[in-house]
């Protein structure tokens, strides 16, 4: 597993809002070993889509990024598509969701969860 240093800038930026929401979700589950896995899969209307899931175990080839007491995991295939991205958590009248601003995406779907490169 590759560790990104806590104080150094990360190739993937997790905002304070995203970290706070993940902390809240982990507290609700009552399992401090949970880590948020951020991944990219084929599919969606633009070719790729983002996904989020909790995981207790980091795979050997995962990149682990620690921010504000939260560990985010990214697998090698997803990492290449997420370098330079910012992951935020937004609350609005339309609902609450994690939002990824990805400079590598050439097009995105209206829902914001699908993209192409």
From Swiss-Prot:
One of its GO terms (biological process) is iron-sulfur cluster assembly. Binds 1 iron-sulfur cluster per subunit. Its cofactor is iron-sulfur cluster. Keywords: Iron, Iron-sulfur, Metal-binding. PROSITE patterns: HESB (PS01152). Iron-sulfur cluster binds at residues 45, 109, 111. Transmembrane segments: none annotated. HAMAP family: Fe_S_insert_ErpA (MF_01380). Required for insertion of 4Fe-4S clusters. Homodimer. This is Putative iron-sulfur cluster insertion protein ErpA. It comes from Chromobacterium violaceum (strain ATCC 12472 / DSM 30191 / JCM 1249 / CCUG 213 / NBRC 12614 / NCIMB 9131 / NCTC 9757 / MK). The gene is erpA.
């Amino acid at each position: 597993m590759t560790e990104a240093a806590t104080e150094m800038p990360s190739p993937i930026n997790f905002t304070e809002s995203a970290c706070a929401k993940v902390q809240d979700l982990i507290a609700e589950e009552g399992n401090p070993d949970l880590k948020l896995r951020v991944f990219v899969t084929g599919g969606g209307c633009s070719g790729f889509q983002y996904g989020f899931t909790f995981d207790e175990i980091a795979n050997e080839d995962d990149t682990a990024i620690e921010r504000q007491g939260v560990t985010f995991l990214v697998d090698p295939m997803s990492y290449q598509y997420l370098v330079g991205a910012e992951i935020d958590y937004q609350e609005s009248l339309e609902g609450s969701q994690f939002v990824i601003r990805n400079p590598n995406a050439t097009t995105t779907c209206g829902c914001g969860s699908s993209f192409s490169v």
